[in-house]
């Protein structure tokens, strides 16, 4: 009942380098979790400063593939959101959706990814990957915001076809039930 309901994002500046040491110094360890549809799982942590919102996405995945992605959906109203998608090579896209339809592709932000394994080699057992992301608040409508709603999602490309996974009981088309991130 209390899992994935809301988390706090402490105010701090994060160096986006793929190392998690900045996050180790933050006493707040609030995270959202996704990981029931396949063996791949992810957590999302958040922080912010005056200019950026930061996300630390940690993915556990035994078989890393190029198609393995993680997406942070940032609500922009009742039926609209910004979708920041990262892969093993960094930011793949930042897109604005309204009523489930892509409206616009945006540029901006930065990501650093640390891969713990061998992408595309299923003969070994990988650990997963970590993505550290900085997105300008102005790019995703968060300038001056005190909180926002978010929906983390992943795609696992193991096996015969990609498997999508997100929070249980939420819709990609309505942000009403998405958990909130409070900007401390």
PLM segments and residue spans:
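Structural preference for beta-rich elements and adjacent junctions enriched in aromatics
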Residues: 1-184
């Amino acid at each position: 009942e209390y899992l994935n309901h809301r988390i706090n994002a402490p105010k701090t500046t994060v160096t986006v380098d793929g190392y998690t040491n900045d996050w180790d110094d933050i006493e707040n360890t609030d995270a959202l979790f996704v990981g029931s549809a396949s063996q791949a799982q992810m957590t999302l942590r958040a922080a912010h400063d005056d200019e950026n919102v930061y996300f630390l996405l940690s993915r556990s995945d035994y078989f890393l593939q190029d198609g393995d992605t993680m997406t942070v959906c940032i609500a922009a109203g009742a039926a609209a959101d910004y979708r920041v998608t990262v892969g093993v090579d960094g930011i793949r896209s930042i897109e604005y959706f309204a009523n489930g339809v892509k409206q616009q592709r945006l540029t901006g932000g930065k990501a650093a990814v640390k891969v713990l394994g061998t992408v595309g080699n299923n003969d070994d057992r990988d650990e997963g990957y970590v993505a550290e992301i900085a997105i300008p608040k102005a790019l995703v409508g968060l300038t001056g915001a005190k909180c926002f709603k978010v929906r983390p999602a992943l795609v696992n490309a193991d096996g015969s076809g990609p498997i999508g996974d997100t929070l249980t009981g939420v819709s990609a088309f309505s942000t009403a039930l998405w958990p909130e991130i409070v900007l401390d």
